[in-house]
Amino acid sequence: MEKKEIITATKDFSEQMVEIDTLNKWYGDFHVLKDINLNVGKGEIVVVAGPSGSGKSTLIRCINRLEEYQEGLIKVKGIEVNADVKNLREIRSNVAMVFQHFNLFPHLSIIDNLTLAPMWVYGKPKKEATDTAMHYLERVNIAEQADKFPNQLSGGQQQRVAIARALCKSPDIMLFDEPTSALDPEMIGEVLDVMIGLAKEGKTMVCVTHEMGFARKVADRVIFMDEGQIVEENDPETFFKNPESDRLKLFLEQILAH
């Protein structure tokens, strides 16, 4: 019998979705981001870790210009992130962000929170917006809560709604800014499960998180930041088992001990 060749699939991240070149940002005299260089390929899952105040959240907020920067260059799908309104509109249509705090409108039902932007910003018909919203509420296992209001949901449920709202844009890139840090410990798993599912679907994701178990399991690359700089980056296996810098070794000792 002829022996069949076994082909092992490998991920191809050659198509660049995010390109960051020599990025610098100051808050007054405080140099918060120092010469950051980072590329993110299509379908790549990048986890950004580091101590509080290291510039992690500021970095990803610069990607869709929620934060302005003073020096350097950022491109999203080849389009420069700058003050040009047309560029910014196109970039933000391709990039969705999930925040630490859910930022749901308390006076709107869950379904209305999800249909508001598609209808009023992007001009989608109500039925289309509603159908899309229900699809993604089902995707995050919370469709039965569609008619409730945010204060009737747990923190974990609200964060899943926030993820569904982000998905309603059909974004090419998803940014997560510490999406579990405001949750009670028992609610963290349900949000991470949704994020793991998105990763398996091939979404391009940049995640700021302290959840090192998620980084080990899902990330293609883990980046360690400290004092506004990228100190080290590597695949998860090397990052956790063979850290090169003393600063990363200390960070891992402290965070993995808890």
Predicted stretch roles:
Residues 13-236:
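ABC family nucleotide-binding domain
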